């Protein structure tokens, strides 16, 4: 086994960075694998756009065309040179360090399950924020630039109040607390795991997103919702959709007769269920149809 097979890829790349073109050519010619590694890395670096780049070490070079950066280590990011094109920043579940050095280009920030640090120092460029299970600080510390807030895995009491700039509020799939009295009147879009009659959905909510919904007479959806997204429905009943709904989106597990959709629906989104379209006629009231 040669030394080139023993050394880590990052070590080899760092060695090459110190060589001029002549020495680099001689070095990589000693190992076909290293040649292809270097060639592949250069191709990646020259891509016009990289959607997601996972950063496994603070010393790694981040391609300038990266737009979504995922930090997979629990270390300060102060020494990381984050490219100006990065707008989405996601931290691993173990991350719980200072976020003082987040650049002002970030608009979407996702903090991991272990994070319980200061959030008042988040740059005002951030509009979308996700918090994890360990976050126990007051939500009022969140910068007023944030309009979309996701509370992930909360298993304890929420430390309010929710900032007045929040218009989109999401409670994660494993959120297990009552939301009664928690949704301010400035929130218009609400995402929750499951709806039941014990939940108090404020009448200022016009867009409701549900992971699952089981219809019965005692569990009817409120009649002031205009936009409705449902991922799972068990079972599907006739006229289970409020008459106020005009925009309707079904998830992957919807497989029902769409002719029962109320006449007020004009915009319909169906994900990976084409049998319901083949077997049934699309209602005449549908003016916009999106299939995934």
Swiss-Prot record:
FNIP repeat positions: 95-134
Classification via Pfam families: FNIP
InterPro entries in UniProt: FNIP, STK_FNIP-Repeat
The protein, known as: Putative FNIP repeat-containing protein L281
Domain of life of the organism encoding this protein: Viruses
């Amino acid at each position: 086994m040669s030394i080139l097979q023993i050394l880590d890829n990052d070590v080899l790349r760092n060695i090459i960075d110190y060589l001029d073109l002549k020495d680099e050519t001689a070095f990589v010619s000693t190992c076909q694998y290293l040649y292809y590694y270097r060639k592949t890395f250069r191709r990646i670096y020259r891509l016009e756009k990289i959607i997601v780049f996972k950063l496994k070490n603070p010393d790694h070079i981040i391609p300038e065309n990266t737009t979504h950066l995922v930090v997979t280590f629990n270390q300060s990011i102060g020494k990381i040179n984050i490219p100006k094109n990065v707008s989405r920043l996601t931290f691993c579940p173990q991350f719980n360090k200072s976020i003082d050095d987040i650049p002002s280009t970030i608009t979407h920030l996702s903090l991991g399950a272990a994070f319980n640090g200061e959030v008042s120092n988040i740059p005002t460029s951030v509009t979308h924020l996700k918090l994890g299970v360990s976050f126990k600080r007051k939500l009022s510390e969140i910068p007023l630039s944030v309009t979309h807030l996701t509370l992930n895995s909360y298993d304890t009491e929420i430390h309010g109040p929710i900032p007045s700039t929040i218009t989109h509020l999401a409670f994660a799939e494993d959120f297990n607390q009552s939301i009664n009295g928690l949704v301010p009147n400035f929130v218009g879009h609400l995402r929750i795991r499951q709806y039941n009659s014990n939940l108090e959905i404020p009448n200022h909510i016009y867009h409701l997103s549900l992971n699952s919904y089981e219809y019965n007479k005692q569990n009817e959806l409120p009649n002031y919702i205009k936009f409705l997204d449902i991922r799972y429905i068990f079972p599907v009943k006739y006229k289970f959709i409020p008459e106020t709904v005009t925009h309707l989106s079904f998830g992957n597990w919807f497989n029902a007769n769409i002719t029962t959709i109320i006449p007020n629906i004009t915009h319909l989104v169906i994900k990976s269920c084409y049998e319901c379209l083949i077997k049934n006629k699309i209602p005449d009231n549908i003016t916009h149809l999106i299939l995934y």
